[in-house]
Amino acid sequence: MAPGPVAEERVRLLQRLGVLCGVAAGAWLGAAEVPAKLVSSGLSPVLVSLVMVMGVFLGRWTLPAMARGTSQTRSDFLQAPHLVIWAILAGCLWAVANTLTIFAIRDLGLSIAFPLWNTNAIIGIAWGVLFFGELKNAGWVRWTAVSGGAVLMFGGGLILARVSASHVSSQAATQGIAAALGAGVLWGTMYIPYRKAYLSGMNPLSFVSFFTIGELGMMALLSAHYIGGVMTLWQQLKEARHLLFWLLAAGFVWVIGDIFQQYAVKYIGVSRGIPLSNSNQLWGLLWGALAFGELRGWGHSAVASAIYGSVLMAGGLAAISCSIAGPSEYEQWRQAATRERKRYGLDAQFVSSGLEGKSAAPAQARSSFDWMLVAAATAAFVWTGFAARWPSKDLNWETAIALSGIGLALFATTVIFLWRATRFN
């Protein structure tokens, strides 16, 4: 039995919801990278990435526990146990990519690094087309929008790469560009497990819980190797204890953006959801240029090139994202879901309910374990918060408050619509 058809009105609702989730993801993913500016305070980029991943780990277990409960996470993975391996693999790819972004920010700054690693959208589009039938039967208008958008993104990335080289040393520019592009390739490939999970009926909140095991495990291994052993790593963590709170918070903020991104991928696909969430490049430019003054001291032509490059990439992202799937293309998604169901012997109702944004199982009450997770995460933030000191960074507070306010408004709006339409399914 194949997954049944979804009513056209329901499809349109879920696709509008996916677009909203992608926009909110961009805002929160952009804000989460701001604490990475701390690398200029003398912290190792690997240490920064490790502590952020610790915050990610806390967020990936506590937010699903509060929203649905870990019992429903367990129920989902009993339906599709093969996705545990895919989730952990995706987490490993993310950990390496995130570490590369810290190096890129250190060498290039937020304003330049963001658009470069957002070439992950091009990789994501390729995998979506090759493996999951995205854009098949989409028509020439949608194909033109997606391919034209990809060309715009690539051109904008080239402009930003060129302008970056004139304001940092040659070696730093080369290393930063390589790190940013490497992160883009890894993140683009990471979306294969995402799409497999959601075509199989998996709830995004369940998938990210096991995803983070791969993240933390891989990041711990990378940190111990790069820094020089567990004892050296522990010593550096103690020396940076006054900054741990901010980096944990950055990881937690990143989780919020990533969860929105997961819902975007689920409801509008990799080839559209990832480019839309990559609007974080604009947030990165706003935070870097306006809140931190990264472009201060640059010449007029250099600033103009940075802005033109970002706008060009944003135009490409908009072209791709506005090319919403039509009925014939959506049918290809259903066929891809059927292939996943047959390949792994999944329950047809579980897959069908997932495609419709519904739960195949009744809601369950929160357990004592759920509240223990929330309490442990809260304790970690309180403990590190007592030792925290404000980083010695120049910050335009008016801009920071305005950007934060917009992000909070997007968060509230998206959560309300997600709850009303899907009950977080």
Locate each region found by the language model.
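Polytopic alpha-helical membrane proteins, predominantly small-molecule transporters/carriers
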Residues: 1-425
